């Protein structure tokens, strides 16, 4: 009986790679395994796309909460040495460089990180590491570097130039990002081929801490630990307060599913509230973050607290109201009946996600930390569903799991990175946030996204079997890393040439911007094609 069960398990595992056998598992509804593989593949692809929409929506909530966290200031009381009077100032709690690496990069990369971690937990007890996690993160790194650069370079208006102001911090982040891929190649091919030891996994994770320390040292210009490079002008605020509301984005409903809730909360009788809001994008790509300040005298602390609490509950209540409202205030302003129907249909499509994510508390509670944590939990849940869909797609289509991992799955889970960098390229006066988010996300993907899952598996295998973790397709993964390293050099060289010739990494003459964008996309296609051919055994 045991031999029969083992043979059945082997057949099911082989079906995931070869696609010859029927996949017996079902996920959407009972009896779906009786459908044809082609129909099941279509259903799973649609489900995967719908999950990406959900990831975009919940990431918008994450961005709002993150902005509130970074904007938090602490009161500092000092004594003037001359007048002996108290001087009250407010200083930012977060250093912007650390916030970029630990909050922005970690948050936008959280779908990929959670996918890899969930995959590692599911594979606990297995001597071979799951291929979905590392493949997704390598593909995500390629998507971050090439398509996101391709988008950011054409985002500024025609003739507008946006360059990196702090080249020292960017170079530190870039060097650590390149070293991450070199390090992966060393442990996969040189140090212990096809094996990940506990020491290797631990060293991978610890390098993330070294990145934080080195980047902070460069930002503060610590001697002996920083590059002696001057810093250009940089904005005082991490998120600019000035906005341009003249733009209208048709994709608004994906990234800002709560703007109407906040607006209705303000319009519904809260007349003693002055709204001081900032959005992460001029066209509402990621939604509005509201800061409510009671329009009362400073000494009316009790009234101020009551007004604040009332507004918090009003906004939270209207999040649920907005989730079940098909026609928003913006769609009512549209003259075309067809566009109004399309917008209503889009709201109907988003309604389940909006209703689910309405449980995330408003971002102005506890400086955004509660919403921050809740958003991460929801992202993890959606990421788990994504792993199930990708497993089933690989099973019914016979596509190699690695190919799915660094193409469709990596592109979809990197959508938050694309949104964040695009917004930064639009709103920031410099290119620091847009480009730094790419390099920081890639570093986080490697040191945390690959290091933590491998650390989980190696620790378990060490105590359970006294064995290391084996990599089933190390050559394919190593080949992808080599291709990515080669193409990324071509990307960085073009950015440096744009800096020297045009004067900025982003923007410039429209023709040159579009040519640069096309070149970056070509590099991504080269990476995807060569990596897919390698893991499929063609080359």
Curated annotation (Swiss-Prot):
Gene that produces this protein: MHX
> Which keywords label this protein?
Ion transport, Membrane, Transmembrane, Transmembrane helix, Transport, Vacuole
Might you name a Gene Ontology BP term for this protein? transmembrane transport
Q: What is this protein called?
A: Magnesium/proton exchanger
Coarse class of the protein's main subcellular location? membrane
Bilayer topology: Multi-pass membrane protein
InterPro entries hit by this protein: CaCA (IPR051171), NaCa_Exmemb (IPR004837), NCX_ion-bd_dom_sf (IPR044880)
Family recorded in the similarity comment: Belongs to the Ca(2+):cation antiporter (CaCA) (TC 2.A.19) family. MHX subfamily.
Instruction: Indicate the transmembrane segments per the record.
Output: 38-58, 98-118, 135-155, 167-187, 195-215, 341-361, 365-385, 392-412, 444-464, 477-497, 511-531
Tissue-level expression reads: Mainly expressed in the vascular cylinder.
State its role. Vacuolar transporter that exchanges protons with Mg(2+), Zn(2+) and Fe(2+) ions. May control the partitioning of Mg(2+) and Zn(2+) between plant organs. Could also transport Cd(2+) in vitro.
Q: Where in the cell is it found?
A: Vacuole membrane
What GO cellular-component annotations does this UniProt entry give? vacuolar membrane
